[in-house]
Design a protein with these regions (language model features):
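Long, hydrophobic alpha-helical segments that serve as membrane-spanning/inserting helices
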Residues: 1-24, 28, 32, 36, ...
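Catalytic-loop region of hydrolases
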Residues: 615
């Protein structure tokens, strides 16, 4: 393949290429049509309609996408017509604006599809307000509404056609991203095995926890893509079998990579003068690179080779372990057992990587069902909406904040009558987020992006007055907005600001829009921030104990599930995968909550240090439990009374801690028998089986971890303030 063809292939395979090309085709079609007719007047409205339709787009199959497009167009038409009819009546208009914003925000309880449609509908309604404000002529407003709906319909039709032509491409893209994130996770995990004394392991563990958030998000997005294409029946066909196997392989990699077989500090101290930990680190790092290469192979649809370096690194590790065993050091006996399990874990990853090219083999005997939490009937949808219609629901409070903030913004417009003031409402809509931390971050990005976009627009209009060039620049800016709007919002804001000014400059003097746009952004951002700060604020610190309780509760359920498989035999079935995914999702929720707390006012944060200590300890707990899951196989656990006692003691302690956290009570006092039981579990007989040895060791490690978990939980609860009960909105 020639270099130019290789470059085009890589560009086409890029995750954003499909989305960007759809937007480019839709916008360039309208641009060419308006240019051909020598009439640029409809272009801004056509662009805005296309943008609203693209914002409403979510990943789905052909039938689902068709339903989404039809629902979007109906919502767009109803919203735009309501704006035109009520615009001259301030009080009914304000009431309708608040009710519509609240109701459309509450649609998010039904899932991502409805949340996107709701956000896009409010956005198009504000676009219609801007049109009414500029022309004050109902006939012109109806014409621009029709143009916006035409732009939305054209993009919707293109989106449906694209889904039919490239039905499985989104699944490949998400699998490729998943393996890339897993590769980065493995490389960060490898850094923990560097046997360097006095190293800041806490910073490395926090970096690993942040990457774990990305891995879990990638797993959830990939599962949603598979569900939308192949359903939840668990009967994949020949073509979809490849995607199912790769997804389950990624889940297994994540469990193996998350596992911890012994405290890293103890391993580093014991084997400081050996190369065994460097061998572990090298193999894990190479496996991370192999995962990234597998993701690239999935994206480019190329073959994948595990690589000779990985095989050699595995052999080197085994030889290093063999040398240590030959030393017959009694102090290393237990640690060498943990290292042997670690080597077996890495060997499992290596084996599956070497078989990745055979991933289209039959899925006989594998439970391929997936949990689908989306509502599919009117009864399920009604139940979701009823749960969201309570003051304790985060979505209810967010919708109320947006509604009241929009009323405040509209009242300010009626009192001050600023030029082009409806951009204030648009800023409120995009800046106001469910949490104060997210709102604060979005405000900074919006203001900085607006300043950058206004500066770029002024410079480009000064340097290049040619209309044709303005059209091309507006098209490029719109494309940049969609490519960056989810990952780099500051750049996306600059791009959409540039596009807006260039489009309005085609119809008049774009320079007069610069200062009003900046002023409206500042006013809207201030109102959105005040709403997040004053109207039923959702401080993460006030409900941190609930998030921590969920972490402990899901860990307890997972422990029960995994030990059941040691007694009854390994089954990678749906209940086990649900318990594992719930545990990881709870861990991610704690990481996200603590990250949001860092952006909250000092008085609302609570004890951040205790929260991060608890996060580090809960990640360690997750690692110990994942090690049990990674090596699960049937073993005679019922014959070992200490294992039964250890399981009962751990489950009782974790259940009590979860209940105390949920109620914001101090953790139950430690039982003196816990330490004695942990010591007894660590006394391993010579003839004990490998699986029983593992279960004993992991239960003992968890028992040793309990005092630290209780202390961190008590410190967090002692400084937390009461929070209202939170109802699930999804």
């Amino acid at each position: 393949m020639r270099p130019s063809e290789r470059l085009l292939n890589r560009l086409w395979a890029h995750e954003k290429a499909s989305y960007g090309l759809r937007v480019f085709i839709a916008l360039s079609t309208w641009m060419a049509l308006c240019w051909y007719r020598d009439d640029l007047q409809p272009l801004p409205s056509l662009f805005l309609g296309t943008i609203a339709s693209a914002i409403a787009e979510t990943d789905d199959n052909g039938w689902g996408r068709s339903k989404s497009v039809l629902l979007s167009l109906l919502c767009f038409a109803a919203a735009a017509a309501s704006v035109v009819q009520l615009f001259a009546w301030p009080l009914p208009f304000a009431a309708a604006l608040a009710v519509a914003a609240f109701a459309l925000t509450l649609l998010g309880a039904l899932g991502e599809r409805y949340a996107s449609i709701g956000q896009a509908t409010v956005t198009l309604a504000i676009y219609t307000m801007i049109a009414m404000d500029q022309h004050h002529d109902t006939a012109i407003a109806w014409r621009e509404v029709a143009q916006m709906l035409a732009g939305a319909a054209w993009y919707g039709a293109l989106s449906i056609l694209w889904t039919l032509l490239f039905a499985n491409r989104p699944v490949r893209e998400r699998l490729a991203r998943l393996f890339a994130e897993l590769g980065r996770y493995l490389q960060l995990k490898a850094d923990l095995f560097e046997p360097v004394r006095h190293e800041d392991l806490r910073a490395r563990r926090l970096a690993l926890a942040e990457q774990n958030v990305r891995v879990v998000e990638a797993l959830d997005v990939t599962k949603a893509a598979i569900l939308s294409r192949f359903g939840r029946s668990g009967r994949p066909g020949v073509q979809s079998g490849l995607y199912f196997r790769l997804y389950y392989m990624a889940q297994d990699f994540h469990e193996r990579a998350s596992s911890s077989h012994y405290p890293y500090e103890a391993l580093a101290e014991a084997f400081f003068h050996s190369d065994v930990l460097y061998r572990c680190r090298r193999l894990l790092s190479l496996q991370g690179l192999a995962c990234m290469a597998l993701g690239q192979a999935i994206r480019l649809r190329h073959g994948f080779d595990h690589g000779e370096r990985n095989r050699q690194a595995g052999q080197d590790l085994e030889q290093s372990l063999q040398y240590l065993r030959q030393q017959h050091n009694p102090h290393w006996r237990r640690l060498l057992g943990s290292l042997q399990l670690l080597a077996a874990n890495l060997s499992g990853i290596a084996r599956q990587l070497s078989e990745a090219s055979l991933a289209d083999s039959p899925l006989d005997g594998i439970d391929t069902r997936l949990r689908d939490s989306s509502p599919h009937t009117l009864r399920e949808m009604g139940a979701r909406l009823r749960r969201a219609l309570t003051p304790g629901s985060l979505l209810f409070r967010h919708g109320l904040r947006i509604a009241l903030a929009l009323i405040a913004g509209y009242a300010l417009l009626r009192l001050a009558h600023p030029d082009n003031g409806y951009w204030v409402l648009l800023t409120i809509m995009v800046v106001c987020r469910p949490s104060f931390g997210a709102t604060r971050l979005r405000l900074v990005q919006r203001v900085a992006g607006t300043l950058l976009g206004l500066g770029a627009a002024w410079a480009l209009m000064q340097l290049f007055p040619d209309t044709t060039l303005h059209l091309l620049l507006a098209l490029a800016a719109a494309l940049l907005f969609f490519v960056t709007r989810n990952e780099r919002y500051l750049v996306a804001t600059a791009a959409i600001t540039l596009m807006a000014l260039l489009c309005f400059n085609l119809l008049g003097d774009g320079y007069v829009m610069i200062w009003p746009r900046l002023l409206d952004t500042l006013i809207g951002g201030a109102i959105a921030t005040a709403a997040s700060l004053l109207i039923l604020p959702d401080w993460e610190g006030r409900r941190l104990h609930q998030v921590m309780a969920q972490v402990i509760a899901t860990s307890t359920r997972y422990l029960d599930e995994v030990l059941g498989q040691y007694r009854n035999g390994m089954r990678d079935d749906l209940p086990y995968r649900i318990a594992r995914r719930d545990m990881h999702n709870a861990d991610v929720a704690l990481s996200v909550a603590l990250a949001n707390m860092l952006r909250e006012p000092q008085y609302a944060r609570g004890n951040l240090d205790a929260g991060f200590r608890f996060l580090a300890l809960s990640n360690t707990l997750l690692g110990y439990l994942s090690a049990l899951g990674a090596h699960r196989a049937q073993a005679a656990l019922d014959e070992d009374s200490l294992v039964s006692q250890g399981q009962h003691c751990v489950q009782q302690a974790l259940t009590g801690l979860a209940a105390a956290l949920e109620a914001r009570h101090p953790a139950p006092p430690a039982d003196a028998a816990e330490a004695m039981l942990a010591d007894a579990l660590e006394q391993l007989p010579e003839d004990i089986g490998d699986k029983s040895r593992l279960v004993r060791t992991q239960l003992a490690l968890i028992l040793h971890l309990l005092p630290g978990l209780r202390a961190a939980a008590d410190a967090a609860v002692a400084t937390a303030r009461p929070a209202p009960a939170v109802a699930s909105a999804a």
